[in-house]
Amino acid sequence: MKCILFKWVLCLLLGFSSVSYSREFTIDFSTQQSYVSSLNSIRTEISTPLEHISQGTTSVSVINHTPPGSYFAVDIRGLDVYQARFDHLRLIIEQNNLYVAGFVNTATNTFYRFSDFTHISVPGVTTVSMTTDSSYTTLQRVAALERSGMQISRHSLVSSYLALMEFSGNTMTRDASRAVLRFVTVTAEALRFRQIQREFRQALSETAPVYTMTPGDVDLTLNWGRISNVLPEYRGEDGVRVGRISFNNISAILGTVAVILNCHHQGARSVRAVNEESQPECQITGDRPVIKINNTLWESNTAAAFLNRKSQFLYTTGK
């Protein structure tokens, strides 16, 4: 009887662990070096390098697949270089896709969860299920702020931290939405893209310049799923084309992209709207992801659009 009971409890625990799996990390904004080191530490723990997109110790990595509902927590530290304060903000990030599911005010032990993340459960906290979703479309509308041209500095992050500490209720406010947009950019998006990491980290220097998010940065974030579907096919071609994004060599890839989705994991969700244009996480299963033209790797949709425009031009000009 005891043996049967033990097996039942063990199965229950294993079943629970398959539903939710979590780890804790810290992103330290004290210095440029601590910031980059924090991001690299997280990447090492949650992803596996692609050997064919690697130079020295730098590589593009693929997120390790975990059970649905798995997440990791990121504690924000070092916003004030001189004092150990502003340390009650924790972001909850879904591991399989690096989407920010919500944030925890650790002073009140309250988890404010976005409406599109009801599948994420955090134990030991009071969960507030918000009516606001996490999409950039919604957050920009509520914030009355476009990401292209959005400025982020140490000072604005402190202000954003205070806005989230003051937040209560179940509907995002303008200030809270602006705060989330800034923190998502310098955490989740910086984990995905070295380009964003590199451009923002300068704002943590003693001269404290302001990082301004460029249209190119925004374009990267909106096409992460498409990039993730193409790069695993890369084998040293002369270039890669995904929409308006071009990589001319492996150095350009490594200087821009750090972590990609696990698009080819069997059973992984293949479609989920992630941006204003409702692009999927990864290309729908069964579609051919890439086409090679003149030793350049083209995302299939990009190639189709390009060839269509070219044929129309030839038709109208009679060439």
Swiss-Prot record:
Chain residue ranges for the region called A1: 23-272
Effect on the protein upon substituting residue 26 to M: In strain: OX3:H21
Effect of residue 17 to P: In strain: OX3:H21
Subcellular location: Secreted
Catalytic reactions on record: Endohydrolysis of the N-glycosidic bond at one specific adenosine on the 28S rRNA
Recorded GO CC terms: extracellular region
Cysteines joined through disulfide linkages: 263-282
Pfam families: RIP
Subunit structure and binding partners: Shiga-like toxin contains a single A subunit and multiple copies of a B subunit.
Function: The A subunit is responsible for inhibiting protein synthesis through the catalytic inactivation of 60S ribosomal subunits. After endocytosis, the A subunit is cleaved by furin in two fragments, A1 and A2: A1 is the catalytically active fragment, and A2 is essential for holotoxin assembly with the B subunits.
Name this protein carries in UniProt: Shiga-like toxin 2 subunit A
The species this protein was found in: Escherichia phage 933W
Organism classification: Viruses, Duplodnaviria, Heunggongvirae, Uroviricota, Caudoviricetes
